């Protein structure tokens, strides 16, 4: 079943056309990455799904319902924004209680689960980015949502906080929660998503399983101990340097075998990452 | 409890956190000090009662308007400017319902609190009569018009400072300019145009009517009634325009 369905969604702000016919689906039970450069239309798309920005045309469905017409769908969908959008003079406890007053849920359990006991009297304005995100996620889960849509949830987090966030996402997904996560921290997003939607200049440029996005082009990335020797071994093939890596279009096993036969140690061998796919599908590859 | 009522409880709580009402209610009660003061000086004449209900002189009215101004600009407005409204609009509530909830919390509750306090006060003082009741109606109409102006400027300008300055300037210009115009028309006995501007400052007409009721034979009362009606209609229009603007606002 489809958790999110967008069909030809268009939105302009004055003369600026932010969304030029965005269409994609998010499968129920998936963790889908929503990836694109700044200004590509990620936040506008998420705001459209949240009912905060009304599209000029197109169709939006969350769990099969129109969020603009059937607001009750918000009982089953949670949004996590880059920063906590709630009056900053409220305390953590007030925020959680307000959410529980509307959506139900066990505040005590959420406090325990997210280890918030010592922070309850803090004002929301006093929270660090990581803690604010933890509080937001705790609030988002009070309603036991079927779908969580997160806009750059890891944007302001340090690496440990990002790890913690992604671990929680994996855990919740195992319990059946569907996620759409926009992010630009691609290397870490890659660890958690199973599908990806690329958006560039207000248009979706790729939608599908992560493996499919990464496999296209069949390029492999090799980190070797002797670049010059490796280049001579691989000469005649489609090979180029990308930072410390050699990028080559060849079967991975064959490349490793021929390099090692020539005495070149292969330190890392990997297929293209989400970063490379990002460049490819967002026209940023140069 | 329905989803809308649950959201309303949260919206209400945000505006009336302690000690908001603990400060406002005593201020509204104590603010009636001008009523006995004017009545004593005026020898319990109706115009004494009318004078004591003129905004600025009547502290209770000023407190009600101040509370509404704070609610509209510094709570609802701030939530819109800073994006906090996103959290409320991702609750199971339509924009129209949210706007009505905010309007009731911001504007209607301060008015009802004021009216309840005044009614009890006037009744206990034995002066709940047609004059004082009329002044409550006149104030209520002007209050709805004024808060309508504040709401519209808040949603259009999207800046607390600009909203405060613009709405205060606009309302003061209407109130003072209209009052001077009405005074000129009344003393020159040129009453034909009075109904047209009566909505700007009905208090001038009310004072003149209570001072010299026999001179104008009801002409001022008619203008006053029309002024109250125009205030109510303009207030309703301003709210409808603000709601339509909010419904299509990108947040």
Q: Predicted segments — roles?
A:
Chain A
Residues 166-249:
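ABC transporter nucleotide-binding domain
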Residues 218-286:
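Short, charged/small-residue-rich alpha-helical element at the C-terminal edge
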Residues 68, 87, 105, 187, ...:
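Short alpha-helical
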Residues 6-9:
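Conserved catalytic Walker-motif region of ABC-type ATPase nucleotide-binding domains
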Residues 2-3:
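Extreme N-terminal starter segment of soluble prokaryotic enzymes
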Residues 11-181, 186-187, 191-192:
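ABC transporter nucleotide-binding domains
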Residues 67-68, 74, 96-104, 109-116, ...:
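Alpha-helix C-terminal capping segments
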Residues 28, 92, 210, 271-274:
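Structural motif detector for alpha-helix initiation sites
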């Amino acid at each position: 079943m489809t958790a999110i369905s967008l069909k030809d969604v268009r939105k302009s702000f004055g003369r600026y056309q932010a969304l030029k016919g965005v269409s994609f689906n998010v499968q129920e039970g998936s963790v889908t990455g929503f990836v694109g450069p700044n200004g590509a239309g990620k936040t506008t798309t998420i705001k459209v799904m949240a009912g905060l920005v009304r599209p000029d045309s197109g169709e939006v469905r969350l769990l099969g319902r129109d969020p603009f017409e059937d607001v009750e769908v918000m009982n089953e969908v949670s949004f996590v924004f880059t920063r906590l959008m709630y009056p900053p003079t409220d305390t953590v406890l007030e925020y959680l209680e307000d959410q529980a007053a509307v959506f139900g849920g066990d505040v005590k359990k959420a406090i325990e689960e997210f280890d918030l006991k010592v922070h309850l009297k803090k004002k929301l304005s006093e929270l660090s980015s990581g803690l604010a995100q933890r509080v937001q996620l705790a609030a988002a889960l009070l309603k036991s949502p079927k779908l969580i849509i997160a806009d750059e949830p890891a944007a302001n987090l340090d690496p440990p906080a990002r790890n913690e966030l992604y671990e929680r996402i994996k855990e919740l997904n195992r319990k059946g929660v569907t996620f759409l996560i926009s992010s630009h921290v691609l290397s870490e997003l890659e660890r958690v998503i199973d599908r990806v939607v690329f958006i560039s200049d207000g248009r979706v440029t790729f939608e599908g399983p992560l493996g499919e996005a990464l496999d296209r082009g069949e390029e492999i990335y090799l980190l070797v101990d002797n670049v010059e020797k490796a280049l001579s071994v691989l000469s005649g093939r489609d090979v180029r340097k990308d930072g410390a890596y050699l990028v080559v279009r060849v079967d991975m096993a064959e490349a490793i075998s021929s390099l090692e036969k020539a005495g070149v140690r292969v330190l890392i061998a990997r297929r293209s990452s989400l970063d490379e796919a990002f460049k490819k599908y967002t026209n940023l590859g140069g | 409890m329905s989803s809308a009522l649950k959201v309303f409880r949260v919206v209400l709580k945000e505006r009336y956190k302690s000690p908001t009402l603990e400060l406002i209610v005593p201020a509204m009660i104590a603010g009636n000090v001008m009523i006995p003061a004017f009545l004593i000086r005026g020898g319990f004449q109706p115009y004494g009662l009318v004078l004591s209900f003129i905004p600025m002189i009547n502290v209770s009215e000023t407190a009600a308007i101040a509370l509404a101004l704070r609610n509209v600009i510094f709570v609802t407005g701030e939530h819109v400017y800073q994006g906090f409204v996103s959290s409320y609009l991702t609750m199971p509530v339509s924009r129209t319902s949210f706007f009505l909830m905010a309007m009731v919390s911001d504007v209607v509750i301060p008015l009802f609190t004021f009216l309840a306090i005044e009614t009890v006060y006037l009744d206990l003082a034995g002066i709940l009569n047609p004059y004082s009741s009329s002044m409550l109606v006149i104030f209520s109409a002007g209050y709805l018009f004024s808060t309508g102006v504040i709401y519209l400027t808040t949603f259009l300008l999207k800046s607390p400072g600009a909203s405060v300055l613009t709405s205060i300037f606009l309302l003061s210009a209407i109130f003072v300019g209209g009052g001077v115009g009405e005074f000129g028309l009344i003393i020159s006995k040129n009453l034909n145009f009075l109904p047209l501007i009566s909505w700007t400052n009905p208090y001038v007409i009310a004072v003149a009517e209570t001072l010299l009721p026999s001179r104008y034979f009801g002409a001022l009362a008619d203008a006053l009634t029309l002024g109250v009606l125009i205030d109510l209609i303009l207030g309703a229009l301003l709210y409808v325009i603000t709601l339509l603007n909010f419904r299509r606002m990108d947040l």
